[in-house]
Amino acid sequence: MANICANMKRCFSPPALRAYFAEFFSTFLFVFIAVGSTISARMLTPDETSDASSLMATAVAQAFGLFAAVFIAADVSGGHVNPAVTFAYAIGGHITVPSAIFYWASQMLGSTFACLVLHYISAGQAVPTTRIAVEMTGFGAGILEGVLTFMVVYTVHVAGDPRGGGFGGRKGPAATALGALVVGAVTGACVLAAGSLTGASMNPARSFGPAVVSGHYSNQAVYWAGPMVGAAVAALVHQALVFPTVPEPAPAPATNESARHGSVQTVVV
């Protein structure tokens, strides 16, 4: 009971509140760019014909959007920007379950607010949701989302491991920027590879906000189950098979439990 009370108390400490806000704002930024680029592409091709240039534009927008989102939050919250990433770090013991729940809430709120703002400033344009292509089954789409998320989350783990260079405070802003760029790049590549099949969400928050604002919740299970399973496998593969030794955490203030995993410093409270 004492441990539970202590954990809950740390969940509302000033460093924790800053971490939650960082997750809210960074997720807001990423989803605003990701969904906004999709709206722009749709306005340029209103007949909804297949357009490779539109796919390229949204992939580039998401790559640079995630790059910026991870970079600005890396030293405060770890720059998760994705409930699947948070889930992976919780499995690895780098963030407590109560903290993960608050991270998820912040990410969901950030995504929803981004879509609300887009809806109202775009003259009432419908907010596009991630959808499964007619050629895909729900099961197949879930597997694909899991594979894509595995690649992204595994990249996050490798790019963030200090034994391979690390980033997020330990190695300086240049290393943070490089790691964030790598994560953004693999995300953009995955959008190019599977954007026409499932929308290449790889991020439950990316699908949740548009669903709430649009009111269309079809196939939400695909965009939650697939990424969560893929993230869990990525965490286990990296931590148990590839790099089984957990890095020592960097010194942190006595009021915090600093859980670093490479590039990502997660303030666990």
Curated annotation (Swiss-Prot):
Family from the record: Belongs to the MIP/aquaporin (TC 1.A.8) family. TIP (TC 1.A.8.10) subfamily.
Q: Name one GO cellular component term.
A: vacuolar membrane
Q: Which GO terms describe its biological process?
A: water transport
**Motif placement: NPA 1:** 82-84
Residues spanned by motif NPA 2 = 203-205
The coding gene here is: TIP5;1
How is the protein disposed in the membrane? Multi-pass membrane protein
UniProt keyword list: Membrane, Repeat, Transmembrane, Transmembrane helix, Transport, Vacuole
Q: What InterPro entries does the database record attribute to this sequence?
A: Aquaporin-like, Aquaporin_transptr, MIP, MIP_CS
Q: Which PANTHER family match?
A: AQUAPORIN TIP5-1-RELATED (PTHR45665:SF27), AQUAPORIN-8 (PTHR45665)
Give the subcellular location.
Answer: Vacuole membrane
Q: What is this protein called?
A: Probable aquaporin TIP5-1
Query: Which stretches are transmembrane?
Result: 19-39, 54-74, 84-104, 139-159, 177-197, 223-243
Question: Per the entry's comment, what about the domains?
Answer: Aquaporins contain two tandem repeats each containing three membrane-spanning domains and a pore-forming loop with the signature motif Asn-Pro-Ala (NPA).
